[in-house]
Regions:
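Hydrophobic alpha-helical segments
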Residues: 1-169
Length: 169
């Protein structure tokens, strides 16, 4: 049986830590999601970048449709789902998207230099909103991947291993 490749929660404590982090910041979470600090399209770009790194099939499907609804072009979405930043991406969002990719690749433990660069490009409330959005999508990704891992184990490797083919845009 081939080993399960995607990132999952390794313990209930890790899962609970993420949930507590988000619950303790409910007001800031609401502000991050209301579209005033971070536009809906920007939020969906961030979520799709993290989802691409973590490879969650459930989040990919949902957030591609949300990104389409937010007005992101099919061409840009194709690039995002390939781990690339499109030339159609608003220039002021690129630093955050590159940071989000690094953040996800480092399993939410970014190096200090990219954190400082993020703070140079965005206000403190925007940086907080970006981090909350990244934490939310990471939690969703790991929940989805952990569910797939359970399917994989229960089915002796028949289900849950490979993410679904990337949706046609």
């Amino acid at each position: 049986m081939e080993a399960f490749q995607r990132r999952t929660y390794k313990s209930f404590g890790e899962f609970w830590g993420d949930i507590q982090h988000l619950l303790s910041r409910r007001l800031k979470t609401k502000q991050a999601m209301d579209g005033e600090l971070i536009s809906e399209a920007f939020r969906e770009r961030l979520m799709n970048v993290v989802t691409e790194v973590n490879d969650c099939r459930y989040c990919r499907s949902f957030h591609l449709s949300q990104a389409s609804r937010a007005g992101i072009s099919k061409e840009e979405l194709m690039k995002l789902t390939s781990g690339l930043i499109s030339e159609d991406t608003p220039e002021d969002e690129i630093p955050a998207l590159l940071y989000a990719q690094h953040w996800a690749e480092q399993n939410a433990q970014p190096d200090e230099k990219p954190v400082q660069e993020l703070k140079e490009h965005y206000s403190e409330p925007e940086v907080e909103a970006i981090h909350i959005i990244l934490r939310m999508i990471r939690s969703g990704n790991l929940i989805g991947n952990t569910f797939d891992y359970l399917l994989y184990k229960l089915s002796f490797g028949r289900w849950g291993q490979s993410p679904m083919k990337k949706p046609e845009l």
